[in-house]
Swiss-Prot record:
Gene behind the chain: rpmJ
Lineage: Bacteria, Bacillati, Bacillota, Clostridia, Peptostreptococcales
Species of origin: Alkaliphilus metalliredigens (strain QYMF)
A Pfam family reported for this protein in Swiss-Prot or TrEMBL: Ribosomal_L36
GO biological process: translation
SUPFAM superfamilies assigned to the protein according to its UniProt record, in alphabetical order: Ribosomal protein L36 (SSF57840)
UniProt name for this protein: Large ribosomal subunit protein bL36
Length: 37
């Protein structure tokens, strides 16, 4: 999980979602998981 100011999809399988008001990226590749902090 990476915590970043700007959350962007890295590959085609990355999905940008909102959970509890925070923007997150979920992906098949665990290295691509990000959340906004």
């Amino acid at each position: 999980m990476k915590v970043r100011a700007s959350v962007k999809p890295i590959c085609e399988k990355c999905k940008v979602i909102k959970r509890k008001g925070k923007v997150m990226v979920i992906c098949e590749n665990p290295k691509h998981k990000q959340k906004q902090g």
